[in-house]
């Protein structure tokens, strides 16, 4: 993770980088395949400690990983955002942890590894933790929505967790957010800049480069996203 000092009134930030490939390299291509995610007990314990520490220090927290969190079996729809990975442990394990800290709850659960022995056990009492200001989870390309609120597949739970990602890599497939690229020009790439207002809990996003149309105006590249739930 890395901490960044910010000025008043927005405060300072902690960005936590997660590793979804936290397993023995010898398992890749056999037990574990491409576009899947597996975490270790050590990483989960570290994440919990790092989140507790950030809350105690009054830092605004952002997590980041190539994948978003959610169920990869979902269809491509606006309502049900779909990550680009199959999670071999529960895809809502880390959202469960963040949620328990946010709402100061006890979390006692075992998240089983579908492909091996990396079962994750969490037995934590977060009732005494300091207030956690969780801003968002940043991820890479996705084939459905670029901004969405994390929720259980069956709609039984909505997390106070905002997911923000980039546009899909190409116009291939059935992606909702298809973008047009012109090879050898600035419109071959696409990226965003984020401005975070921690007072009003808004994120202002500015997109650059390739867009959904060749005539995408500057106003069409601007969006305001609330993380106040």
Which residues does each PLM region occupy?
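Short, well-ordered beta-strand micro-motif
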Residues: 3-5, 17-19, 193-197
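Conserved beta-sheet core of the metallophosphoesterase superfamily
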Residues: 79-200
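Short acidic, glycine-rich surface-loop motifs adjacent to enzyme active sites
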Residues: 52-74
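Active-site-proximal beta-strand elements of phosphoester/diester hydrolases
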Residues: 11-26, 64, 160-168, 205-208
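Divalent metal-coordination and catalytic microenvironments
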Residues: 18, 47, 63, 141, ...
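Binuclear metal-dependent hydrolase catalytic cores centered on His/Asp/Glu-rich metal-binding motifs
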Residues: 7-58, 83-91, 221-222
């Amino acid at each position: 993770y890395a901490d960044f000092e910010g000025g008043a009134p927005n405060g300072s930030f902690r960005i936590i980088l997660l590793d979804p490939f936290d397993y023995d390299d010898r398992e890749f291509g056999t037990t574990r395949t491409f576009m899947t995610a597996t975490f270790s007990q050590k990483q989960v314990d570290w994440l919990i400690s790092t989140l507790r520490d950030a809350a105690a220090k009054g830092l605004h927290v952002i997590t980041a990983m190539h994948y978003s969190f959610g169920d990869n079996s979902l269809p491509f729809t606006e309502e049900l955002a779909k990550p680009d990975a199959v999670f071999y442990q529960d895809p809502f394990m880390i959202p469960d942890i963040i949620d328990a800290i946010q709402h100061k709850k006890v979390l006692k659960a075992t998240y089983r590894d579908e492909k091996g022995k990396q079962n994750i056990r969490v037995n934590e009492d977060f009732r005494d933790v300091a207030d956690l200001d969780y801003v968002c989870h940043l991820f890479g390309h996705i084939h459905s929505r670029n901004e969405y609120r994390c929720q259980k597949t069956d709609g039984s739970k909505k997390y106070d967790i905002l997911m923000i990602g980039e546009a899909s890599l190409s116009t291939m497939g059935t992606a909702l957010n298809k973008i047009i690229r012109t090879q050898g020009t600035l419109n071959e790439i696409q990226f965003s800049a984020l401005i975070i207002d921690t007072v009003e809990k808004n994120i202002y996003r500015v997109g650059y480069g390739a867009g959904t149309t060749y005539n995408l105006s500057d106003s069409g590249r601007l969006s305001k996203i609330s993380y106040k739930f």
